[in-house]
């Protein structure tokens, strides 16, 4: 979106704040229904970021696929799980939770140190694909494919990782 600077910054800060609150809600809320709704809020905030970054296709795909399909699937899976199982579990912190927290904190700090030091120029190899698109030799579906493989490669891969993690979580919850 082409918004004035202060409005763009306010929306980015608001989206980041709501994203953090939603992420904490996913992790800290004990009721799995509330946690699933918090996940939906996180996915909507990610879509807001894509809108603010002028990636409208990725934003709409995020809304339709992840919020509209995957999150609804997770909510249905949580609703089919027996609710009394959640209230009986009094052991809130296990060794697996500690190990998972350690791995996640390590990944976050390594990303925080790696991303600012990375030269992203070599990753965006879009010159040739942009020349093909500008010549008008391909149709719209091919343009979407080229943009997903070049301009939106990193967001597309991150979305696929989110999908994989959500499917693993849904399968784990269904087995319990």
Curated annotation (Swiss-Prot):
Cite a GO CC annotation: chloroplast thylakoid membrane
Supply the alphabetized keyword list: Chloroplast, Membrane, NAD, NADP, Plastid, Plastoquinone, Quinone, Thylakoid, Translocase, Transmembrane, Transmembrane helix, Transport
Q: Any keyword Chloroplast?
A: yes
- Any GO molecular function: NADH dehydrogenase (ubiquinone) activity
Its placement in the membrane is given as: Multi-pass membrane protein
Subcellular location(s): the record lists: Plastid, Chloroplast thylakoid membrane
Which reactions does this protein catalyse? a plastoquinone + NADH + (n+1) H(+)(in) = a plastoquinol + NAD(+) + n H(+)(out); a plastoquinone + NADPH + (n+1) H(+)(in) = a plastoquinol + NADP(+) + n H(+)(out)
Specify the enzyme's EC class, one word: translocase
Q: Which InterPro entries match?
A: NAD(P)H-Q_Oxidoreduct_6, NADH_UbQ/plastoQ_OxRdtase_su6, Nuo/plastoQ_OxRdtase_6_NuoJ
Please give the chief subcellular localization of this protein.
plastid
What EC identifiers does the entry list? 7.1.1.-
Q: How does it assemble?
A: NDH is composed of at least 16 different subunits, 5 of which are encoded in the nucleus.
State the similarity comment. Belongs to the complex I subunit 6 family.
The name of this protein is: NAD(P)H-quinone oxidoreductase subunit 6, chloroplastic
**Organism classification, top ranks?**
Eukaryota, Viridiplantae, Streptophyta, Embryophyta, Tracheophyta
What gene name is given for the protein in this entry? ndhG
């Amino acid at each position: 979106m082409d918004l004035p600077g202060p409005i763009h910054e306010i929306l980015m800060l608001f989206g980041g704040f709501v994203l953090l609150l939603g992420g904490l809600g996913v992790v800290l809320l004990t009721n799995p229904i509330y946690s699933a709704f918090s996940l939906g809020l996180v996915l909507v905030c990610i879509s807001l970021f894509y809108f603010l970054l002028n990636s409208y296709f990725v934003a709409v795909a995020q809304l339709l696929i992840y919020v509209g399909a995957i999150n609804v699937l997770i909510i249905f899976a949580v609703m089919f799980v027996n609710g009394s199982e959640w209230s009986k579990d009094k052991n809130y912190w296990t060794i697996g939770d500690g190990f998972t927290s350690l791995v996640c904190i390590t990944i976050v700090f390594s990303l925080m140190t790696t991303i600012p030091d990375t030269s992203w120029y070599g990753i965006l190899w879009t010159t040739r694909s942009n020349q093909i698109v500008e010549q008008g030799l391909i149709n719209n579906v091919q343009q979407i494919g080229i943009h997903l493989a070049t301009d939106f490669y990193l967001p597309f891969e991150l979305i696929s990782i989110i999908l994989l993690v959500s499917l693993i979580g849904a399968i784990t919850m269904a087995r319990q």
